[in-house]
Amino acid sequence: METLTSRQRTVLEFITAHVDRHGYPPTMREIARHLNVNGTLGVAKHLEALARKGYLQREPGNSRGITLTGQTRHTPTVSLPVIGVVRAGVPQIATEEIEEHISIDQSLVKGGAFFLRVKGDSMINAAIIEGDLALVRPQQTAENRDIVVAMIDGEATLKRFYQGADHIRLQPENPNMAPIIVRSGVQEAWIIGKVVGIYRRMD
């Protein structure tokens, strides 16, 4: 079967979950609401592509006329939220607002994982650029050299982690930028999670 774009996979995952939960497929308007888009024209195009690629069949004139093919369930996927913005540069508040959902292979993640969108160029030498989606596994500890999402005085930043005797160092991967030094009792800082993958859209 042909590969799917991230948006097509999100639609397919939502349809599959809806069928599993309710016993019948969603309408195009329900899919549009899930994608947080106005109108159903884009949804119709995604459904046409999924049908053309063999993942489902459509019944014209039926608002719920979507039938999943048997091959659809061979690779379990999970739909993860994209939340807020992490600024890879000067820390910026990460608003916990879900922008969209992206489906990936379920075997790649554990419960609670999410995507954060990267902004800035402080991690370019780690091949992380503006617009990338950082796949974050929630955890409160890290090892030296882990790339983490950390909160500093209520602001989020994505950096490489180093533990010192009385401080932590959040190191950018850009020689033109200085590290962030967080000393015990001076600033409030904690780790949100470890970056375990980077996803970049090519479309």
Curated annotation (Swiss-Prot):
<keyword id="KW-0234">DNA repair</keyword>
<keyword id="KW-0068">Autocatalytic cleavage</keyword>
<feature type="active site" description="For autocatalytic cleavage activity">
    <location>
        <position position="159"/>
    </location>
</feature>
<dbReference type="GO" id="GO:0004252">
    <property type="term" value="F:serine-type endopeptidase activity"/>
</dbReference>
<dbReference type="Pfam" id="PF01726">
    <property type="entry name" value="LexA_DNA_bind"/>
</dbReference>
<dbReference type="InterPro" id="IPR006200">
    <property type="entry name" value="LexA"/>
</dbReference>
<keyword id="KW-0378">Hydrolase</keyword>
<dbReference type="GO" id="GO:0001217">
    <property type="term" value="F:DNA-binding transcription repressor activity"/>
</dbReference>
<keyword id="KW-0804">Transcription</keyword>
<dbReference type="InterPro" id="IPR006197">
    <property type="entry name" value="Peptidase_S24_LexA"/>
</dbReference>
<dbReference type="InterPro" id="IPR006199">
    <property type="entry name" value="LexA_DNA-bd_dom"/>
</dbReference>
<dbReference type="InterPro" id="IPR036388">
    <property type="entry name" value="WH-like_DNA-bd_sf"/>
</dbReference>
<dbReference type="InterPro" id="IPR050077">
    <property type="entry name" value="LexA_repressor"/>
</dbReference>
<dbReference type="GO" id="GO:0006260">
    <property type="term" value="P:DNA replication"/>
</dbReference>
<keyword id="KW-0235">DNA replication</keyword>
<feature type="active site" description="For autocatalytic cleavage activity">
    <location>
        <position position="122"/>
    </location>
</feature>
<keyword id="KW-0227">DNA damage</keyword>
<dbReference type="GO" id="GO:0043565">
    <property type="term" value="F:sequence-specific DNA binding"/>
</dbReference>
<dbReference type="InterPro" id="IPR036390">
    <property type="entry name" value="WH_DNA-bd_sf"/>
</dbReference>
<keyword id="KW-0678">Repressor</keyword>
<keyword id="KW-0805">Transcription regulation</keyword>
<keyword id="KW-0238">DNA-binding</keyword>
<feature type="site" description="Cleavage; by autolysis">
    <location>
        <begin position="88"/>
        <end position="89"/>
    </location>
</feature>
<dbReference type="InterPro" id="IPR015927">
    <property type="entry name" value="Peptidase_S24_S26A/B/C"/>
</dbReference>
<dbReference type="GO" id="GO:0006281">
    <property type="term" value="P:DNA repair"/>
</dbReference>
<dbReference type="GO" id="GO:0032993">
    <property type="term" value="C:protein-DNA complex"/>
</dbReference>
<comment type="function">
    <text>Represses a number of genes involved in the response to DNA damage (SOS response), including recA and lexA. In the presence of single-stranded DNA, RecA interacts with LexA causing an autocatalytic cleavage which disrupts the DNA-binding part of LexA, leading to derepression of the SOS regulon and eventually DNA repair.</text>
</comment>
<dbReference type="InterPro" id="IPR036286">
    <property type="entry name" value="LexA/Signal_pep-like_sf"/>
</dbReference>
<dbReference type="GO" id="GO:0045892">
    <property type="term" value="P:negative regulation of DNA-templated transcription"/>
</dbReference>
<dbReference type="GO" id="GO:0006508">
    <property type="term" value="P:proteolysis"/>
</dbReference>
<feature type="DNA-binding region" description="H-T-H motif">
    <location>
        <begin position="28"/>
        <end position="48"/>
    </location>
</feature>
<dbReference type="GO" id="GO:0009432">
    <property type="term" value="P:SOS response"/>
</dbReference>
<comment type="similarity">
    <text>Belongs to the peptidase S24 family.</text>
</comment>
<keyword id="KW-0742">SOS response</keyword>
<dbReference type="InterPro" id="IPR039418">
    <property type="entry name" value="LexA-like"/>
</dbReference>
<comment type="subunit">
    <text>Homodimer.</text>
</comment>
<dbReference type="Pfam" id="PF00717">
    <property type="entry name" value="Peptidase_S24"/>
</dbReference>
<protein>
    <recommendedName>
        <fullName>LexA repressor 2</fullName>
        <ecNumber>3.4.21.88</ecNumber>
    </recommendedName>
</protein>
